[in-house]
C-alpha cells in the first residue's frame, strides 16, 4: 500500500505554509508527493483537465491512500476533477486534510459551501481543525464521515528544500 499527499505549488500565503508543514511530516513518514500546480484551470477544457488529472494521479495504484490537502487553491472544478481521477482506483482511501474553506478565502474559484460539501462527502476520512468546523459542515450537508482533529498549526518545523 502506497501513501501519497498532495502539495500545490505556485501559491503563497498561509495556505502555502500549512501545506509545507504537512509536507515535512509526510516526507519524514516516507509518503510520496502528488504535485499540483496553481494555474487558471478554466484554460483547460473538461477533456484536457481529465487528461491532466490522469497524468497527475498516474503513480497512484489500487489500495493506495491519498491525503488531499484541501483546498488545492486552484479551484473547485480542479479539485472535483482530481478527486474523480483518484476515486477511479480500486480500494483507494481518500483523506481530505481541510486546511481552510475555499469559499471564504478564494471566492472566485470556490463560489459556495454547497460545492465544497459535495467534494468533502467524497472522503473516506476528514482531518479537520475543530469540532466546531465539523458541526458547521454537518449543518451544510456533510455526511457521517470519520474525523480526526488537527488543532495545532503553529509549531516549529524545518523547511524542506526541493
Regions found by a protein language model. Name each.
Residues 1-3, 161-162:
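A short, charged/proline- and glycine-enriched loop
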Residues 1-2, 32, 93, 124-125, ...:
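Residues at the starts of beta-strands that form the adenosine-phosphate
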Residues 4-5, 96:
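Structural beta-sheet core signal
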Residues 5-21, 73-75:
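A short, glycine/small-residue-rich beta-strand->loop->alpha-helix junction that serves as a flexible
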Residues 6, 29-46:
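A short beta-strand-loop structural module common to alpha/beta enzyme folds
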Residues 16-24, 131-134:
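Short, surface-exposed alpha-helical segments at coil->helix boundaries
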Residues 45-136:
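Extended catalytic core of nucleotide-activated donor transferases of GT-like folds
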Residues 124-138, 142-161:
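Donor nucleotide-sugar binding/catalytic pocket of nucleotide-sugar-dependent glycosyltransferases
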Amino acid at each position: 500500500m502506497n501513501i501519497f499527499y498532495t502539495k500545490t505549488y505556485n501559491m503563497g500565503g498561509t495556505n502555502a505554509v500549512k501545506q509545507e508543514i504537512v509536507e515535512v511530516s509526510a516526507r519524514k513518514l516516507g509518503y510520496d508527493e502528488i504535485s499540483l500546480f496553481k494555474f487558471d484551470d478554466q484554460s483547460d477544457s473538461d477533456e484536457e483537465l481529465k487528461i491532466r488529472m490522469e497524468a497527475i494521479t498516474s503513480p497512484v495504484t489500487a489500495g493506495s491512500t491519498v491525503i488531499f490537502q484541501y483546498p488545492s487553491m486552484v479551484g473547485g472544478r480542479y479539485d472535483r476533477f482530481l478527486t474523480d481521477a483518484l476515486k477511479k482506483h480500486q480500494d483507494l482511501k481518500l483523506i481530505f486534510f481541510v486546511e481552510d474553506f475555499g469559499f471564504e478565502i478564494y471566492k472566485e474559484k470556490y463560489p459556495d459551501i454547497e460545492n465544497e460539501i459535495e467534494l468533502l462527502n467524497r472522503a473516506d476520512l476528514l482531518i479537520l481543525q475543530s469540532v466546531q468546523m465539523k458541526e458547521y459542515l454537518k449543518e451544510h450537508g456533510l455526511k457521517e464521515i470519520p474525523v480526526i482533529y488537527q488543532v495545532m498549526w503553529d509549531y516549529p518545523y524545518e523547511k524542506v528544500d526541493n
